[in-house]
Design a protein with these regions (language model features):
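Well-ordered alpha-helical scaffold segments within catalytic/enzyme domains
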Residues: 1-3, 57-75, 123-133, 160-169, ...
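Extracytoplasmic/secreted proteins, especially bacterial periplasmic and envelope-associated proteins
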Residues: 6, 10-17, 57-60, 64, ...
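Non-catalytic C-terminal accessory modules of carbohydrate-active enzymes
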Residues: 175-329
């Protein structure tokens, strides 16, 4: 909360600037001289008109502004940003969804949808949960798992693509992709992750970027995103309230035989171990629920699991003792 208080005034001025660049439809649209950028792509990305990825990110930014306004006690700002976000969100599907393509199109120019479909707006809309479950599943098939859609070749943006798949329960497929893509860099001799990686390139092609033969960064922080995915979607640790005052833990093996890891929080570490029969969870501070998928009632050393639905249980954790759970897949 203290950190948000420090940043909030600058967040407001930034959002005021963005709001000042919206068109008559309330959507952000590039002006002459603007560099509209989402990713380095090995193909043509049209930047004309209203871009779907830009509106989805703009909407999420307004929602985040409302959340931060609430944290700092700015009730007027909260109401303002909530209204702006809700208004824009209501326009996303009517503007960009194409039933024939079963996806968001890339842009709308002069009131007409383009024929192009790219991954960006579609994957963002999935893990922002801007679409219903049926349309999210449609996007998985028509976009995320469709090799004919322009591929993403930067580790940073691949992270969002894989997060969308994780959000759809595809951890096993994502694990294979992480091993192939980030593992591909390691096989090329990488000791740190690169700014851009195209598995189809060979030799010194991997070093070229920006029109220069050795222009690529081979130690790029934005390439480290598997760490986030492993913590959130495999170890399953997420904040429920600001600063992890309350947490949720929902481990998923995702094709692994076992896993073990620690997620640091402001209140201390949350340690998770899981194999096909056992979970071990230890949270040094804070409180929250551990979700357990089990055909039969799980056995635990501390506490009593509560049945949430068929095959799903949860255990409340409010002390630092290790919880040991035996479950049945």
């Amino acid at each position: 909360r203290h950190f948000v208080n420090q940043l909030y005034p600058r967040m407001q001025t930034m959002m005021d600037y963005v709001l000042g660049r919206t068109n008559k439809n309330g959507m952000v649209e590039g002006m002459t001289g603007d560099w509209v950028f989402v990713d380095w792509a090995d193909g043509y990305l049209d930047k004309k008109g209203e871009l779907s990825f830009e509106q989805v990110l703009f909407c999420r930014s307004l929602e985040t502004m409302a959340l931060c306004a609430d944290l700092v006690g700015d009730e007027i700002g909260k109401q303002k940003y909530e209204k702006l976000a809700a208004t824009l969100k209501a326009k996303l599907e009517p503007t960009f969804w194409n039933n024939q393509k079963q996806a968001f199109v890339h842009n709308r120019v002069n009131g007409r949808q383009s024929d192009a479909v790219t991954r960006y707006a579609n994957m963002f809309s999935v893990f922002f949960q801007y679409l219903n479950a049926d349309k999210q599943q449609a996007i998985k098939k028509s976009v995320l798992l469709n090799d004919s859609i322009l591929k993403i070749t930067t580790p940073y943006m691949r992270f969002y693509e894989l997060e969308a798949l994780c959000a759809l329960g595809e951890q096993e497929a994502v694990m294979k992709e992480m091993k192939a893509y980030w593992g591909g860099m390691l096989k090329e001799g990488a000791t740190s992750f690169w700014e851009k990686y195209n598995p189809e390139e060979t030799g010194t092609q991997h070093l070229a970027m920006y029109g220069r033969p050795y222009g690529k960064s081979l130690c790029h922080a934005w390439g480290a995103s598997p760490i986030y995915l492993l913590g959130k979607y495999y170890l399953g640790v997420k904040p429920v309230k600001e600063g992890y005052k309350e947490f949720a833990i929902a481990p998923v093996l995702g094709g692994l035989k076992w896993m073990e890891g620690t997620v640091p929080t402001p209140n201390g570490d949350i340690h998770v171990y899981m194999n096909g029969k056992t979970m071990k969870v230890k949270a040094t501070e804070g409180e929250g629920y551990l979700t357990i998928n089990s055909r039969r009632p799980p056995k635990v050393n501390i506490g009593t699991p509560e049945k949430v639905s068929e095959g799903v249980w949860r255990l409340w954790i409010d002390s630092p003792e290790e919880r040991i759970v035996t479950y049945h897949l």
